[in-house]
Amino acid sequence: MLKAIAHKVFGSRNERYLKGLRPLIEAINAFEPQIQALSDDAMRARVAELRQEVAEGRPLDDVLPETFAIVREASVRSLGMRHYDVQLIGGITLHQGKIAEMKTGEGKTLVATLPVVLNALSGKGVHLITVNDYLAKRDAAWMGKLYGFLGLSVGVIVHGLDDQQRQAAYGADITYGTNNEFGFDYLRDNMKFYQEQLVQRPLNFAIVDEVDSILIDEARTPLIISGQAEDSSTLYARVNALIPMLRRETHFTVDEKARTVLLTDEGVARMEDVLKIDNLFDPANITLQHHVLQALKAHHIFQRDVDYVVKDGQVIIVDEFTGRLMPGRRYSDGLHQALEAKELVQVEAENQTLATITFQNYFRMYKKLSGMTGTADTEAVEFREIYGLEVISIPTNKPMVRKDFPDLVYKTQREKFEAIAADVKDLHKRGQPVLVGTVSIEKSELLSDMLKKTGVPHDVLNAKNHEKEAEIVALAGHAGKVTIATNMAGRGTDIVLGPGVTDLGGLHILGTERHESRRIDNQLRGRSGRQGDPGSSRFYLALDDDLMRLFGSDRLKGLMDKLGMEDGEPIENRMVSRAIENAQKRVEAHNFEIRKQLLDYDNVMNQQREVIYSRRRELMGSDEPETFVQEHIEEIVDEIFAPFAALKGEPDPELLEVAAAQIEDILDYKIELADGGEAEKQAVLEAVTGRQRELAETAGAHYKEVARYFLLDSLDRHWKEHLLSMDHLRDGIGLRGYGQKDPKQEYKREGFELFQQLIYNMRDAAIRALSRVRIRAEVQEQEFQHKDETANVQYSGPAESAEDAKKEPKRREAPKVGRNDPCPCGSGKKYKKCHGAK
């Protein structure tokens, strides 16, 4: 009640924000006559002066009105387009690090030029992030005319560029590219060995186009760079052949909402019988158990032509949000291999994670982040909670006149599609263009076959023919055109109405199913009614649609039966629409929780990643890597002799033997310790340090590179093993809940212990190698050139788990584990016989 009164008196937060921008808009408009009077050269010269002023410390906010006025005039002269006042509002919103929600056709591409030019004045780089290579190249070429007119340089990051081309693109004032390319470049940079090989500058300011798609839809998809692990392709084929023997509900259960599969007791017994093993859950059989579950997922959760397609003997992932094919991307954790075995194509070798990051953590590294989209308001809470981004709805330049008709609900898929085909035929007869949105390739092809039978000419736009995407979308608004599009394929290309279409009612949007997110439905609707054009939309649903089936259609079915509805007769009322919206809200909340969980777990990894990556940068950029070597040697010697400093009386001979063995193992120095006192400690330190000095004299100028090589090589090898250990920990952490422990807290605690172990292991391995290296006086620098880790790797999408690795990394003995205690890895062996074995 109080909220409603306050809203009436003061207006909404959005309205107050927009009102507060009026003085700035007036200031920009006041500059216009002055800027219009400048020649092209004078305008360029003024931009150069502004750059100098900003470099000398003048805040960007001070130069905003003049810069925006310059960009507006430059746009008129170079592109023939003038920014409306509402577009200036969008530009200010983006500059202030917020999300600008702008309806389709309101010129988001042009709006971005305002904050891009303003922030480019700092010389620190501006990244404009799009959803695909086509849009990155198109926008860079199109808006590049404006930037070039003002004397600013533009680069484009697309798939297939080499490091030199990437360095040039990142060195430009403004860089366009896709979220994947930016993220993978960050990971690749943190696998490089020399500073001059780095391609990215520090992350300054990013504008994310279609921000909802990138920061929300793809947030569950970590970026993963992986290399090949040991081959187990024959095992996939063997397990795949056993799957038909298992019966659903009897041998296994499927949870479609959570997309998980579980074996029942009967299923476990059946598998043990056919695999000729005693216990499927024995640690020795963990790989077999994993293969069985992945094969079940491949057969019973992942559907051909919905989740993936088979093309040229390869399983290619279909992006669930855009319907586009994603060649080169592979499911990790052996799921892709299970799908290959299912489809009887060649099974490729499995992968091991080399580097990974989520989009959530990558984008939060930017000093300033903002975004644009046509639909963000439904996820405003998530943007605020996870990214600290406020969503501002920008008013349209002309009022929206599109008519959104209520949903029609049918009993079955058959009735629904027959009604759709009949309505499309009627609309086509009238000449009104129709855009039909489907949720999968399978459904788009089913509808296409039905329309062929009724003689309606049409275009199909799905992952199988996205090469013609822009061309098909550009013509979709012409009279008589019928276009079937999978999901939101074709976003970013405006559908312009052809001659005479306005009189026919504009573009009609026909949705064949509600998406689990209201935002995706709104995106489909938003293709019609751009810039004040007429248009209409309607969704057709069936009680056996996935959303309805999984999230409560029983009450509706009962209602339809009570009403005694005939076959083919739809129901259309508010209660139905409300029930559907509630189902969508439940799914959205469920997905938000999943993304939040992912972030909570990844935050643990992120803190560790930041420490390791900043250490790498420090080593790469250091002129004196030998100082790290000296520090490490001193730390190791201190730790080995620490137990003796606290002792009163004679030390235990066994303890002295252990210490001497450690000195020989890590420092390659033989000594018989008498008492472990300060004198012996200094003797060891002097001997080991002296040998490093000799090494430095022999190697001369190359010693620094040798030291850097061993330090970085050790860091990279152990970081890879640590990623694997963290994956294993993550997979099993859910079981801690059965022991009345919070899995998240346990993951943090155990993850920290593993990380401490990693730090020790990296240090010890580097010094162990450096203590044994022998360098000839005529050493060649390339002998210590590090092989390029990024040469033969794969870039992949969602990492559901990482059970695929076979090798548990060797860990330093932790003080909390006794040598006769059970090993913490879960093998059931004593620690001294397992990971405590030297």
UniProtKB/Swiss-Prot annotation:
Organism domain of life: Bacteria
Subcellular location per the Swiss-Prot or TrEMBL entry: Cell inner membrane; Cytoplasm
Known catalysed reaction(s)? ATP + H2O + cellular proteinSide 1 = ADP + phosphate + cellular proteinSide 2
Q: How is the cofactor bound?
A: May bind 1 zinc ion per subunit.
Q: Which residues bind Zn(2+)?
A: 823, 825, 834-835
- Region annotation (Disordered) maps to 781-838
**UniProt EC number:** 7.4.2.8
Give the GO biological process terms: intracellular protein transmembrane transport; protein import; protein targeting; protein transport by the Sec complex
Quote the Gene3D superfamilies the UniProt record gives: Helical scaffold and wing domains of SecA, P-loop containing nucleotide triphosphate hydrolases, SecA, preprotein cross-linking domain
Q: How does it sit in the membrane?
A: Peripheral membrane protein
User: In what ranges is there compositional bias, type Basic and acidic residues?
Assistant: 781-790, 803-819
**Cofactor section:** Zn(2+)
| Known function | Part of the Sec protein translocase complex. Interacts with the SecYEG preprotein conducting channel. Has a central role in coupling the hydrolysis of ATP to the transfer of proteins into and across the cell membrane, serving as an ATP-driven molecular motor driving the stepwise translocation of polypeptide chains across the membrane.
Assembly behavior: Monomer and homodimer. Part of the essential Sec protein translocation apparatus which comprises SecA, SecYEG and auxiliary proteins SecDF-YajC and YidC.
Q: Which family does it belong to?
A: Belongs to the SecA family.
Q: What is this protein called?
A: Protein translocase subunit SecA
User: Which species?
Assistant: Solidesulfovibrio magneticus (strain ATCC 700980 / DSM 13731 / RS-1) (Desulfovibrio magneticus)
Query: In the UniProt record, what gene is named as encoding this protein?
Result: secA
